[in-house]
Amino acid sequence: MFRNQYDNDVTVWSPQGRIHQIEYAMEAVKQGSATVGLKSKTHAVLVALKRAQSELAAHQKKILHVDNHIGISIAGLTADARLLCNFMRQECLDSRFVFDRPLPVSRLVSLIGSKTQIPTQRYGRRPYGVGLLIAGYDDMGPHVFQTCPSANYFDCRAMSIGARSQSARTYLERHMSEFMQCNLDELVKHGLRALRETLPAEQDLTTKNVSIGIVGKDLEFTIYDDDDVSPFLDGLEERPQRKAQPSQAADEPAEKADEPMEH
């Protein structure tokens, strides 16, 4: 992307009716590591790919606990996600103290949409550079919502965001009809297979780089990390080998894809 006279502030429209600062924020989501969300009739599942800043650093948390019935996975700027997560936790606490009931998932997503819309309209502010997948369970059943830096939000049956997420969305679209009838183990496996599609051919899912969040009927939101992920990965079949492109010469190394930013 190249700078132009219409991207100096979020309040400036281009002649084509675009707000470039918002588009730049949405590009930040595409640079974050991939995450997948999907649901059945009884459960909602989040599966996220964790990334370490360096070999000396621990892997960043990609799935965050909001309330007993809600959790989120993030792609983009972690600092922005932490701020939004704290806001969501406060709203859930307010609902429990004031109304003595858990906050409905759709209501919480609406509040997030209102909060993220404010920086897109005021001078001197910038949009939040993070996308969220929100999984929850309430009286209406399981939910998976996607939020964007543009303040749009969508109710989804399955969704993936982050780097190389198009490959995961292709898998989800291909198996969409199976999700509603799946039990919990099968649903998690579908999420892991979709997430695996975002990885380069030489990499695979491990207990170190995968995090899983599950919520559902009679099951509070639970995050599985490290060794807790092993039972789910053990039941996953080996990754099929991708065929080499016929047009690529055997003696020429494959071009290295652009590495996404560390988010």
From Swiss-Prot:
* Bias (Basic and acidic residues): 253-263
Question: Which GO cellular component terms are attached?
Answer: centrosome; cytoplasm; nucleoplasm; nucleus; proteasome complex; proteasome core complex; proteasome core complex, alpha-subunit complex
Q: Kindly list the positions at which Phosphoserine occurs in this protein.
A: 110, 177
Name the Pfam families for this protein.
Proteasome, Proteasome_A_N
Cross-link type Glycyl lysine isopeptide (Lys-Gly) (interchain with G-Cter in ubiquitin), placed at 115, 208
Q: Could you tell me in which tissues this protein is expressed? A: Ubiquitous.
Which residues are annotated with the PTM N-acetylmethionine?
Answer: 1
Region annotation (Disordered) maps to: 232-263
Please list the residues annotated as glycosylated: 110
Superkingdom of origin organism: Eukaryota
Q: Which UniProt keywords apply?
A: Acetylation, Cytoplasm, Glycoprotein, Immunity, Isopeptide bond, Nucleus, Phosphoprotein, Proteasome, Ubl conjugation
PTM per Swiss-Prot/TrEMBL = Proteolytically cleaved from a C-terminal extension in the course of the conversion of the proteasome from its latent form into its active form.
SMART domains per record: Proteasome_A_N
InterPro entries per UniProt: Ntn_hydrolases_N, Proteasome_alpha, Proteasome_alpha-type, Proteasome_alpha1, Proteasome_asu_N, Proteasome_sua/b
Molecular-function annotations in GO: lipopolysaccharide binding
* UniProt record, GO biological process: immune system process; negative regulation of inflammatory response to antigenic stimulus; proteasome-mediated ubiquitin-dependent protein catabolic process
CDD domains in the record: proteasome_alpha_type_1 (cd03749)
Q: Where is this chain's protein located in or outside the cell?
A: Cytoplasm; Nucleus
What job does this protein perform? Component of the 20S core proteasome complex involved in the proteolytic degradation of most intracellular proteins. This complex plays numerous essential roles within the cell by associating with different regulatory particles. Associated with two 19S regulatory particles, forms the 26S proteasome and thus participates in the ATP-dependent degradation of ubiquitinated proteins.
The family this protein is said to belong to: Belongs to the peptidase T1A family.
Q: How does it assemble?
A: The 26S proteasome consists of a 20S proteasome core and two 19S regulatory subunits. The 20S proteasome core is a barrel-shaped complex made of 28 subunits that are arranged in four stacked rings. The two outer rings are each formed by seven alpha subunits, and the two inner rings are formed by seven beta subunits. The proteolytic activity is exerted by three beta-subunits PSMB5, PSMB6 and PSMB7. Interacts with NOTCH3. Interacts with ZFAND1.
- Name of this chain's protein: Proteasome subunit alpha type-1
What is the species of this protein? Answer: Rattus norvegicus (Rat)
